[in-house]
């Protein structure tokens, strides 16, 4: 899953935002053969794709670009320039190059256990929001709570019982 040598302009040219792709394999059985819409590009050289209601970050070698007419899907808004924030990508959770702690946690759990883990964190951040004196801290806690839902949706396919 580690991607070391990639060229972002080349990746963006091959898989522009809102272009249509088909997943041709490489490990994610739940989306094998599905068509999706490119929603962005990760800082690790992966292509972010929406397959219906599911989202995945996929190696470019596992994607086949399709003509726009092959799949009718609504356009997605081009993502704002990715800024690593201490809410969504804190440096202290990066274990190895391109591997975050949440990925290891998801791989060690069933989907149900991972759901509970994420729900517990959502509750923790919502319950502690506003308990500190700074308004910025409350906003940050609420953003962290919302981000755990995104993390669950993004990484539940890594769980060892995911199909």
From Swiss-Prot:
Looking at the Swiss-Prot or TrEMBL record, what is one Pfam family this protein matches?
Answer: DUF3310
What's in the keyword line of the UniProt record? Late protein
Its biological function? The function of this late gene protein is unknown.
Q: What is this protein called?
A: Gene 1.7 protein
